[in-house]
Amino acid sequence: AVCVSLLGAANIPPHPLNLINFMEMIRYTIPCEKTWGEYADYGCYCGAGGSGRPIDALDRCCYVHDNCYGDAANIRDCNPKTQSYSYKLTKRTIICYGAAGTCARVVCDCDRTAALCFGDSEYIEGHKNIDTARFCQ
């Protein structure tokens, strides 16, 4: 099933192209009843920052994604949060384009891996908006 929701799209503030690409990848891989925003403050690592031990498989996806962005940032002139890239959503998978090892390809691969991981991991409602000071040390 394909999920499309344009309701309220006119009120969405502009984001860096990379974030838009990542959101599109996430929407492509997660269950239809979820929105990409439900993953923005989940566990210890999904969202801004992160600390402690990931609390479940989904949170581990975000932990790995954070580390992947950290590795990408070591590429000369690479800012993973703003880097644009080319990709294709097809046959329930995601294909990244570009030369291996380039900033664009590495960042795309980080986002691709995370989005596919989200699709394969259970979303536990009780792990949304957790008390990070208590559970993420």
From Swiss-Prot:
BP terms from Gene Ontology: arachidonate secretion; lipid catabolic process; phospholipid metabolic process
Q: For this protein, what reaction is catalysed?
A: a 1,2-diacyl-sn-glycero-3-phosphocholine + H2O = a 1-acyl-sn-glycero-3-phosphocholine + a fatty acid + H(+)
Disulfide bond sites: 44-136, 46-62, 61-117, 68-110, 78-103, 96-108
Q: What is its main location?
A: secreted
User: How far does the signal peptide extend, from start to end residue?
Assistant: 1-9
Q: Highest lineage ranks of the organism?
A: Eukaryota, Metazoa, Chordata, Craniata, Vertebrata
Instruction: Detail which positions bind Ca(2+).
Output: 45, 47, 49, 66
Task: Please give the subunit comment from the record.
Answer: Heterodimer; disulfide-linked. The A chain has phospholipase A2 activity and the B chain shows homology with the basic protease inhibitors.
Q: What is this protein called?
A: Acidic phospholipase A2 beta-bungarotoxin A chain
Cofactor(s) recorded for this entry are: Ca(2+)
The lineage's top-level taxon is Eukaryota
The entry's note on the tissues where this protein occurs is: Expressed by the venom gland.
EC numbers, comma separated = 3.1.1.4
Q: What's in the keyword line of the UniProt record?
A: Calcium, Disulfide bond, Hydrolase, Lipid degradation, Lipid metabolism, Metal-binding, Neurotoxin, Presynaptic neurotoxin, Secreted, Signal, Toxin
Active site annotation, chain numbering: 65, 111
As recorded, the propeptide runs across: 10-17
As for subcellular location, the record says: Secreted
The terms under GO molecular function for this entry are: calcium ion binding; calcium-dependent phospholipase A2 activity; phospholipid binding; toxin activity
Return the PANTHER family for the record. PHOSPHOLIPASE A2, PHOSPHOLIPASE A2 FAMILY MEMBER
Q: How is the cofactor bound?
A: Binds 1 Ca(2+) ion.
PROSITE patterns recorded for this chain? Answer: PA2_ASP (PS00119), PA2_HIS (PS00118)
- Identify one Pfam family in the record: Phospholip_A2_1
Entry's Gene Ontology cellular component terms: extracellular region
Sum up the protein's function in the record's words. Answer: Beta bungarotoxin is a presynaptic neurotoxin. The A chain has phospholipase activity. PLA2 catalyzes the calcium-dependent hydrolysis of the 2-acyl groups in 3-sn-phosphoglycerides.
The Swiss-Prot or TrEMBL record describes its family as follows: Belongs to the phospholipase A2 family. Group I subfamily. D49 sub-subfamily.
